[in-house]
Amino acid sequence: MELYSLTIHELRELLKKREVSALEVTKSYLERIKEVEPKIDALVTITEDFALQKAKEADEKIKKGEDTALTGIPVIIKDNISTEGIKTTCSSKMLENYIPPYNATVVEKLLEEGVIILGKSNLDEFAMGSSTENSAFKTTKNPWDLSRVPGGSSGGSAAAIAADEAAFALGSDTGGSIRQPASLCGVVGMKPTYGLVSRYGLVAFASSLDQIGPFTKDVTDCAIVLNTIIGHDPKDSTSLKIDKPDYTSYLKEDIKGLRIGVAKEFFGEGIEEGVKETVQESIKVLQDLGAEIIDISIPYVEYALPAYYIIASAEASSNLARYDGIRYGHIAEKYEDLIDMYMVTRSEGFGKEVKRRIMLGTYALSSGYYDAYYKKALKVRTLIKNDFEKAFEKCDVIIGPTSPTVAFKIGERANDPLAMYLADIYTVSVNIAGLPGISIPCGLSDGLPVGLQIIGRHFDEGKILNVAYAFEQANKFSAKPQAIGGAR
C-alpha cells in the first residue's frame, strides 16, 4: 500500500507512531503528482520546495509533541484561495502572475496546524463553470475516464483527490462547485453552512453564495478537516459566531429513526436512468439501516437555476469590476485613453464564460430590468428558503442525486451554456438557501461514479456527517479510477 493512497486518519496513525515521517509522506505525494499529473492536468502550480520545507517543520512539531489532527498532512488548494507568496490565478489571464501578499484565513488555519501545501488546483475561470473547461490554462481530465470532465468549478481539486495527488483538497462552492465535481470524480465533497467557514482571502465570485469546503477520500477525513477550517473570523463580515463542535463525534453508524426526506423534484426530467437507479438503491440502504424515508416536496426549487444565474451573475458583475488593470492583475499594453485601457484590459483578461456572466449580471441590474430580473430572483430565493424550512419540519435531512448525470465528455457541452448550467440543477438551491450539503460516492453507472447528496438544516453538519458515515460504512464504495493506471 503506497502512502499516497491512505486517508488522513490512516496517515495520522502512522505519523503519531513515528512509523513514517511527514517528509516521507510528502515525497510520496510529490512522486505521485509527477506520475499522474501529465495525464489529468489538475494543478496550475506545484510548490515542491515549499512543501518539503513545511514537511521538515511538521516533523519537528511531531517530535516535540505539538502535533494536531492535520500535522504533516498534504493538501492541494483551489487556485482562487489566496496563498501568500504563491501564485493565485483563478485560472484567468487577468491574474496570471498575481502573487497575494497574504494568506486566506483557511490557509492560515491549515498552516498553523502543520499542513503541507503541495500546490494549487485548476478551476473554471473565476469559479464560473461546471466542467473546468473554462480555465485559461488547461482542461482538467476526469481520472475515471480521461475523455470526460471532472466537473466544476473545483474540478482540479476533485480530480487531484480521486487520483491521490493529495490527502485532501480545498474548493469553493457557489452553486455546486464542490459537490458536483466530487460526485463526478467519486470523492467526498462538502459545502458547509454559509458563514461557517471564513471567506477572507477567497477571490469573490458571488459573495452571498460562495463558501469554502473540503474534498476528502472518506467521510471521517471530511469531519477532521471541517474541525480545523470552521470558526468565526472578524476579517469576514459574513462569518458567524457559533460554538465549535467536534464533528468526528457524529461519525456513528446508528441512524435508526432518523427521518430522511426524498424530494420528488430531485428526480425529474433530465436525470439519467443509471443515476436515478443508483440513488434509489442508496435510499434502500438507508432504509435498511433503520431510517424513516419520507416523501417531501420543494415546489419552488424548479426556479432555483434561473434565480441562481441572475443573482450570481449580478454579484459577479459587481465583484469583477475591480479588475481594471490599475492596481494589480493584467493590464493592456496598447490603448488610447483611460476608458479604452479598461475596455482592452478586460477584453484581453477575461474569458468567454466570465464575459457572458458579467454581461448577464449587468443587464439584470440595469435600471430598466432590475425589478423584472434581480428583484424577482431575490423573491424566489426567499420562497426556496421557506420551502426548505417547511420540508425540514417533516424530516431531519434531505437526500437525492448530486448531479443529474455522470461525467460528460470534454467538449460535449462547450457550445451549449444551458446544457452546462443544468449540471448544477440539484445543487444551486442549497447555496440559495445557505444550507450545508455533502456529496458522497454511492455507486457506479456505466463505470462512472454517482454522487448522493445529503442536505441538512443550517449548522446541522453533524447530522449530515452522521448519515453520510452510516451510509459509507454500509455501502463500502471501493471502486477506484483506472484511467490513470489504476490509482490506489
From Swiss-Prot:
- Top-level enzyme category: ligase
Enumerate the catalysed reactions: L-glutamyl-tRNA(Gln) + L-glutamine + ATP + H2O = L-glutaminyl-tRNA(Gln) + L-glutamate + ADP + phosphate + H(+)
**Any one GO molecular-function label of the UniProt entry:** glutaminyl-tRNA synthase (glutamine-hydrolyzing) activity
Q: Which residues form the active site?
A: K78 (charge relay system), S153 (charge relay system), S177 (acyl-ester intermediate)
According to the lineage, what is the superkingdom? Bacteria
Query: What family classification does the UniProt entry report for this protein?
Result: Belongs to the amidase family. GatA subfamily.
Q: What is this protein called?
A: Glutamyl-tRNA(Gln) amidotransferase subunit A
What gene is this protein translated from? gatA
